[in-house]
C-alpha cells in the first residue's frame, strides 16, 4: 500500500500535471530546477567542466555533488510531509532544487553561479504562477464593497479569505477554498475573498498583516451579523500567526461548516450564532462589483 498510494495519486493527478506543463511558468521553472543536471550530464555542454572525479570524467557527478543532491532530496521529503496539495509539493521541489542548483553552479564556477542567479531573478520578475481559474461560488470584494456586503444582510454568515497573489500559500489554498465554496455555499452561508496585497487599507482595517514574516496569509475570518466571530490562523502576542494547516478537513472542522450549512438552510432562530472566539492575543463561480480574477 505504501507504494500503491503514491502511484494512484500520481495517476489521478496526470490531467492536472499535463495542464501545468503547458504553461510557461512551470516549463521555465522545471528547466531552471534541472539546469545543473543538464549542464553536467549532456554533451557537449559538460565537456571542459571542472571535476573532482578520479577518472576525470566531466560528464558525471563527483562525490560532493552527489552529497548535495542527496541532502536536497532529504530536505524536500521533510518539507513535503506538511504539504497538502500537489501545487505545494511541486512548489517545494522547484524552490529547493533552485537553491541546490545555485550552490552547485557556484561550486563549479563563480561565473556560472552568477549567471544562474541572474536567470532566476529575471524569472521571478517576469513570470508569475498562474491563478486558479476553476469553478467556484466566491464573491470577490474590493476595499469598498466588503464592508457594504457584510452589513447588507446580517442574517447571512460569511467566510472571507484575505489573500495576496504573491503568496504561495494563498495560491495553494485557492483550489481547496473553491471546492469548499462549491460544497457549502447556500443562501445563508456565503464565501468571499479580498486581495489585501492590492487593498492595503483592508488589511489594516481587519488586522491582517501582509508581511511574509508574520505568516498571516491566507487568513480566514468567519463573520456573523456583520461581526468577526473567529479567524484562522490565530495571532500570538508577537503578531505572528499560530501554526495552522489550511487543509479542507481542518477548515470544515474548525469553522463547523457542516453545522453552519445545515443551520443556514433553515429559517434563522435566536441564539443560532457561534459564540465569539477569544483571541490568542490582542493583536489586532460568482464574481461581482467590478472584481474578477484577472484584475487581481
From Swiss-Prot:
The cellular component terms of Gene Ontology attached to this UniProt record, alphabetical and capped at eight, are:
endoplasmic reticulum membrane; mitochondria-associated endoplasmic reticulum membrane contact site; mitochondrial membrane
| Keyword tags | Disulfide bond, Endoplasmic reticulum, Membrane, Mitochondrion, Phosphoprotein, Signal, Transmembrane, Transmembrane helix
Task: Give the residue interval(s) assigned to the motif Di-lysine motif.
Answer: 293-296
Q: Which residues lie on this side of the membrane: Cytoplasmic?
A: 126-296
Coiled-coil spans in chain: none
- TM ranges are 103-125
| SUPFAM superfamilies for this protein | Thioredoxin-like
Ranges for domain Thioredoxin? 114-270
Task: Note down the stretches annotated as region Disordered.
Answer: 266-296
Q: Where is the signal peptide?
A: 1-48
Is NAD tagged as a keyword?
no
Locations listed in the record: Endoplasmic reticulum membrane; Mitochondrion membrane
- One biological process term in Gene Ontology: brain development
Q: Which CDD domains match?
A: TMX2
Topological domain ranges for the Extracellular compartment:
49-102
A GO molecular function annotation here is: disulfide oxidoreductase activity
The chain residues annotated with the modification Phosphoserine are 211, 243, 288
The membrane topology of this protein is: Single-pass type I membrane protein
**How is the quaternary structure described?**
Monomer. Homodimer; disulfide-linked. Occurs in both reduced and oxidized monomeric form. Oxidative conditions increase homodimerization. Interacts with CANX. Interacts with ATP2A2.
How does the record comment on the protein's domains? The thioredoxin domain lacks the 2 redox-active cysteines, suggesting that it lacks thioredoxin activity. The di-lysine motif confers endoplasmic reticulum localization for type I membrane proteins.
In UniProt terms, what function does this protein have? Endoplasmic reticulum and mitochondria-associated protein that probably functions as a regulator of cellular redox state and thereby regulates protein post-translational modification, protein folding and mitochondrial activity. Indirectly regulates neuronal proliferation, migration, and organization in the developing brain.
Protein name stated in the entry = Thioredoxin-related transmembrane protein 2
Amino acid at each position: 500500500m505504501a507504494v500503491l498510494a503514491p502511484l494512484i495519486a500520481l495517476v489521478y493527478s496526470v490531467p492536472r500535471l499535463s495542464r501545468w506543463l503547458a504553461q510557461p511558468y512551470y516549463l521555465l521553472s522545471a528547466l531552471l530546477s534541472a539546469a545543473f543536471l543538464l549542464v553536467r550530464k549532456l554533451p557537449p555542454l559538460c565537456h571542459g567542466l571542472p571535476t573532482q572525479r578520479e577518472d576525470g570524467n566531466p560528464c558525471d557527478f563527483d562525490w560532493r555533488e552527489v552529497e548535495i543532491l542527496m541532502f536536497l532530496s532529504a530536505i524536500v521529503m521533510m518539507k513535503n510531509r506538511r504539504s497538502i496539495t500537489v501545487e505545494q509539493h511541486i512548489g517545494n521541489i522547484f524552490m529547493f532544487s533552485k537553491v541546490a542548483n545555485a550552490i552547485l553552479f557556484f561550486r563549479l564556477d563563480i561565473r556560472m553561479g552568477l549567471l544562474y542567479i541572474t536567470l532566476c531573478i529575471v524569472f521571478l520578475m517576469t513570470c508569475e504562477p498562474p491563478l486558479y481559474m476553476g469553478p467556484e461560488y466566491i464573491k470577490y470584494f474590493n476595499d469598498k464593497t466588503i464592508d457594504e456586503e457584510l452589513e447588507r444582510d446580517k442574517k447571512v454568515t460569511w467566510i472571507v479569505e484575505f489573500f495576496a497573489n504573491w503568496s504561495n500559500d494563498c495560491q495553494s489554498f485557492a483550489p481547496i477554498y473553491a471546492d469548499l465554496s462549491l460544497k457549502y455555499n447556500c443562501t445563508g452561508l456565503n464565501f468571499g475573498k479580498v486581495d489585501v496585497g492590492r487593498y492595503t487599507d483592508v488589511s489594516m482595517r481587519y488586522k491582517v498583516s501582509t508581511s511574509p514574516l508574520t505568516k498571516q496569509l491566507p487568513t480566514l475570518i468567519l463573520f456573523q451579523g456583520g461581526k468577526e466571530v473567529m479567524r484562522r490562523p490565530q495571532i500570538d502576542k508577537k503578531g505572528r500567526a499560530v501554526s495552522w494547516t489550511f487543509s479542507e478537513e481542518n477548515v470544515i472542522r474548525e469553522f463547523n461548516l457542516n453545522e453552519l450549512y445545515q443551520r443556514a438552510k433553515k429559517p434563522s432562530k435566536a441564539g443560532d450564532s457561534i459564540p465569539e472566539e477569544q483571541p490568542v492575543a490582542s493583536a489586532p463561480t460568482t464574481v461581482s462589483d467590478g472584481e474578477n480574477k484577472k484584475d487581481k
